[in-house]
Structures are given as structure tokens and as C-alpha cells.
Amino acid sequence: MASKREASPSLRMRKIVLVICEGETEVGYINLLKMWYRSPIRIVSHIEGTKITPALVEKRTKELQISHLDKVNTFLMYDMDVRTINEKLQKCKAQMLLSNPCFEIWLLLHCKDQKAAINSDSLIKELKKSANVWKNYSKAAFKETQKAFLNNNTDVAVKRAKRLCEFQNPSTGIYKLIEMLKNLEGKRKE
């Protein structure tokens, strides 16, 4: 009878999540997800924001594949408020985590439903009014109270986001990444 040995680390498939982001706020949020889910998330610099192309996405994905066994799930986390970038994104081979009009719709969904179309400036104002933790919201970094609020209200934000029509204003696909991370986390615990 053959012995059951665990595959050596070099022969095991690594699951890697690559999130190519548009800006600093998105990168900050992905860093929170890395902390909360302890998942192998790799973030490509937000400097690539407007320079996004199918070739760039393919290059970044291949850079992470150390072995042919590595499985890289590539996501693009972008705002839909710039039409020229939307056209570039549609040509890329990756899962879309698009927010319409902008990333802050995801933050707002942690507080309340938003079903009416809204522009980016009005959305930021609405976010700041929605809960005390967002009163002094700044795109640069999340405060500790905001991090805790996001973590505690993620499930309700996912439910709200799933009820919105993808790519319409308002909408966000960020919930897809959350669901995948929860699924990976659940499998790791089994």
C-alpha cells in the first residue's frame, strides 16, 4: 500500500488573487481584505490605473505564476465614471469588480441601500451623512472606526450589492471578490 504523503510545497497548486486597482482607496480596501481573510491577495500598483490594457493584465497575471500549477484569479477593481477606461476594461481577460459611479458606492452599501442613480460628488456627500464613522471620510486612508464598521457590515453590503443591476448606476461588483474570499477561507478551514 502506497504511503499518503502530502505534496511538497513546490508541487501544490497555489491560489492567488490578483486585484488590479485604479486608485489608493481601492488598494487600502484590498489591504483590509488581506488582513481580514488572510488570503493570498497581490495588488498591482494603482499607478497602472489609466494605463490598463489587455497586455498589461496578461503580463501581471503571468508574473504571479511561479509554476504551471498556480491558479491566478485576476480581478479589475475600477470606477465606471470614466468612459474611456470602461472601454479598455471590457477588452481585458479578468473578472470585473466595477463600481458605478465610483468605489464609494460599496462603502455606502455598508450603511444603507442606494437604488437611485447618483453622481460621484453626491455619493461622497451621501456617504458622509449616512453614518457617523463616515463624517470625516477621506479617500487617502481608512480610520480604525471605519475599518471596524466595514468589517462588521460586509454581509449586509454584499446582499445590497447583489440586488443592484450590474454596470447600472448605482452598482458594484466588489461583492464577487468578498464571496470568493469567503469561499476560499471556508475551504481552508475544512
Explain the meaning of each model-derived region.
Residues 22-23:
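Helix N-cap/beta->alpha junction signal
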Residues 52-60:
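Structural motif
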Residues 2-16, 27, 31-48, 61-75, ...:
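C-terminal accessory helical subdomains adjacent to catalytic cores in phosphodiester-
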Residues 19:
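Conserved SAM-binding loop
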